[in-house]
Regions:
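S-adenosyl-L-methionine
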Residues: 1-19, 220-253
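Core catalytic lobe of class I
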Residues: 2-216
Length: 253
């Protein structure tokens, strides 16, 4: 049901390898996005909010970019994808740029969804306690009015135990559930695999791309943990790993 690869979502050959001829209709992703503001104010914290100096967490690829770098990254990620509907996380700094990029990719911007985390984050002054989700569409939507979703989703943060910007599964489950008129989910910035977890809960096939090898392993390990399924197929550098190697790499002791 799910496909995961370690690759670059801006490379057509990597997208083709992941999708393998399939055409997921939903784009659901959380790209690095506070990075533009961080770079231009000469900060080094990026979208994780605070640097992790203990060496325990892999660095997020593309987390510290200029605004132009962010635009190039998102433009590349939205090029030649089959998706008809898009949910993309962002913040107030990057919203205006993302709006233009999504429209340029052929989506009509339909909604601004607010994730209310319940408590403010770190810092001083007006500390942020929300993130934004842009919803865009290339085709007609068929939302079920009986589900009663509003555009403010109040859900507590996750513990970030797997990824510095890990999103709560419950949050992504609501996005997947409310778009049940579409089939298949593509996430070009896989992170900790929360998109895959939400899709597994709702029976949606998912196609997950992650640039960092360490986080790609995190996604596979998470899938095995939440499903209990150990019959995963793993190919590395063109070689399909035997069952015992997969167990040694991904399964808990």
């Amino acid at each position: 049901r799910h496909r995961v690869i370690c690759g670059d979502c801006t490379r057509p050959e990597d997208r083709a390898l992941l999708l393998d001829g399939n055409k997921p209709e939903i784009l659901l992703t959380d790209p690095p996005y506070c990075s533009g503001g961080s770079k231009e104010s000469q900060k080094s914290t990026g979208s994780i909010g605070t640097e992790r100096k203990n060496g325990k967490a892999p660095k997020i690829a593309n987390d510290i970019l200029s605004t132009r770098g962010y635009q190039n990254l998102i433009r590349g990620a939205l090029t030649d994808i089959p998706c008809l509907y898009a949910y993309i996380f962002t913040d107030w700094r990057m919203w205006v740029y993302l709006f233009d990029l999504v429209e340029a990719a052929g989506f009509g911007v339909k909604s601004e969804i607010v994730w209310d985390k319940g408590t403010p984050g770190m810092g001083v002054g007006w500390r942020s306690q929300h993130e934004l989700i842009l919803f865009g569409a290339k085709a007609a939507t068929h939302f079920d009015g009986h589900k009663g979703y509003g555009n403010v989703l109040s859900i507590s943060r996750s513990g970030n135990e797997l990824h510095p910007t890990q999103k709560p599964v419950e949050l992504l489950e609501k996005l997947v559930d409310n778009t049940d008129f579409a089939t298949g989910v593509y996430d070009p910035f896989g992170g900790s695999g929360t998109t895959l977890a939400a899709c597994e809960a709702y029976g949606q096939p998912s196609y997950i791309m992650e640039l960092t090898p360490a986080f790609t392993d995190v996604i596979v390990k998470r899938y095995i943990r939440i499903t209990g399924k150990t019959t995963v197929r793993c190919v590395r550098q063109g070689r399909e790993l035997p069952r015992e190697e997969i167990a040694a790499i991904f399964e808990p002791d």
